[in-house]
């Protein structure tokens, strides 16, 4: 209804919403890392080799390409170091960079893991996303309580380490 004052600007608002939510830079990932000083550094301590490092509850949000509705939640990253580290805030920057497009949670999980591997040499990398999908809330089954969890483990798979990581999530 183009005569309704509340709806007149809705098409423009929708356009601006999608434009803002998917505002991805023209930089490719390597350029993005260079511009934002995202690089791994070798630890001076030999104790950093084989140490397990975990980051929990890193917020993430994106738009699902199936229904064009947001999904949001947390990312959990754990890795076994090969003597290299990455500044903790850099993980959030990588997640934000990769989530600024229409995607699926499964694809985003895979991309976060593979892109971290491009700049951080590790023995094992484990990435988990736990997200709420708006499509589950506002359409179909209208479930307010469900979350979707996606997980990926790259490189050496150590069940003991995975079990240790999982009890913290």
What is each of the regions a protein language model found here?
Residues 1-169:
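A domain-level signal for the structural core that forms small-molecule/cofactor-binding pockets
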